[in-house]
Amino acid sequence: MTGKGQGFGFGLGKMKELAEAFKKAQQVQEGAKRLQEELEQMEILGEAGGGLVKVIVSGNQEPKRVEISPDALAQGADLLSDLVTAAMKDAYIKSTATMRERMEDLTSGLELPGF
C-alpha cells in the first residue's frame, strides 16, 4: 500500500463519479414513483374475436373492466371463455411491453461507476 492518501483506491475522481451516480439513482427513483402512478392511471386494451371481447387493464396489469359484445354471448359459454382468456392475454402482453419500455426509458443513461 502506498501512503499517499489514496485509501482503497478511491481517489477524488471516483468520489465525484459515485456522487453523480447517487444523484442519477435518486432521479431514477423519483421517476419510478411517477411512472408507477402513470401506469396505474393507464388503460390498455386487449381484444379477441375481432373486438367481440375487450379487456381493459392498467399499465401494471390491474384489471379495470371487461366488455363483452352481445354477439359473443351467442357463441356459447366455451367459446366465450376462450375469447375472454385470449383478450386477457392480449392485454397482459401489451401492458407488460408498455411497462418494460417505460422502465427502459427511465433507466437509460444510468451508468454506475465500478459496476
From Swiss-Prot:
Record GO terms (molecular function): DNA binding
UniProt cross-references to SUPFAM superfamilies, sorted A to Z: YbaB-like
Compartments it resides in: Cytoplasm, Nucleoid
Keyword Cytoplasm attributed: yes
Main localization category: cytoplasm
Any single Gene Ontology cellular-component annotation: cytosol
Matches recorded under Pfam families: YbaB_DNA_bd (PF02575)
Listed InterPro entries: YbaB-like_sf, YbaB/EbfC
Keyword tags: Cytoplasm, DNA-binding
Subunit (UniProt): Homodimer.
Function: Binds to DNA and alters its conformation. May be involved in regulation of gene expression, nucleoid organization and DNA protection.
Family stated for the protein in its record: Belongs to the YbaB/EbfC family.
Record-given protein name: Nucleoid-associated protein Ava_2322
Organism listed in the record: Trichormus variabilis (strain ATCC 29413 / PCC 7937)
